[in-house]
From Swiss-Prot:
It comes from Listeria innocua serovar 6a (strain ATCC BAA-680 / CLIP 11262). GO terms for cellular component: small ribosomal subunit. Gene3D superfamilies: Ribosomal Protein S4 Delta 41, Chain A, domain 1, RNA-binding S4 domain. NCBIfam families: PRK05327.1, rpsD_bact. Keywords: Ribonucleoprotein, Ribosomal protein, RNA-binding, rRNA-binding. InterPro entries: Ribosomal_uS4, Ribosomal_uS4_bac-type, Ribosomal_uS4_CS, Ribosomal_uS4_N, S4_RNA-bd, S4_RNA-bd_sf. This is Small ribosomal subunit protein uS4.
Length: 200
């Protein structure tokens, strides 16, 4: 399945989550596109709930179905809770860390920065959004990209940086200083539904 590249607000309204990070797409019409109002939602089956939860998380991180399932399978080989390990692996993606550092306003924009070669890991350019960042690795903006307008605009509006990452706005350098706790990740996601979905 290809990655969705259409308007994010449509997906946000359909799934009931904000992909922009602002929540504005849900303020005026907090129901799926095509519906005439919030009372038009049909009763969802257990399978439907599980599938919807999977889609929420997949679109939140902007992954294809194959990428999503591969990461899920990788998480299953780790010690600990499958669902929590899955969430943490998603959070360790390079494009997500770039987003968490405030270098991009959305994960989609962060993925473009990585794809276009604006980001380095431990001093080496990495253009693979799915690259798994390890604790202690240094993420930086390339010197040639330091004046990138998209990065500058994002830094102007970004204020919250999670405790598990550190960022120096002067040097445009950050790092993953520890793995995140589940309580620090998306509270609106019930990863148990996703584990159940793939266990069917």
């Amino acid at each position: 399945m290809a990655r969705y590249t259409g308007p994010s607000w449509k997906v946000s309204r359909r799934l009931g989550i904000s992909l922009s990070g602002t929540g504005k797409e849900l303020e005026r019409r907090p129901y799926a596109p095509g519906q005439h109002g919030p009372t038009q939602r049909k009763k969802i089956s257990e399978y439907g709930l599980q599938q919807a939860e999977k889609q929420k998380l997949r679109h939140m991180y902007g992954l294809t179905e194959r990428q999503f399932k591969n990461t899920f399978n990788k998480a299953g080989k780790l010690q600990g809770k499958h669902g929590e390990n899955f969430m943490i692996l998603l959070e360790q993606r390079l494009d997500n860390i770039v987003y968490r550092l405030g270098l991009a306003r959305t994960r989609r924009a962060a993925r473009q920065l990585v794809n276009h070669g604006h980001i380095t890991v431990d001093g080496k350019r990495v253009d693979i959004p799915s690259y798994q960042v390890s604790v202690g690795q240094v993420i930086s903006v390339r010197e040639k990209s330091a004046k990138n307008s998209a990065i500058a605009e994002s830094l102007e509006v970004s204020s919250f940086v999670p405790e598990y990452v550190t960022f120096d706005a002067e040097t445009l350098t950050g790092s993953l200083n520890r793995l995140p706790e589940r309580s620090e990740l998306a509270a609106e996601i019930n990863e148990a539904f996703i584990v159940e979905f793939y266990s069917r």
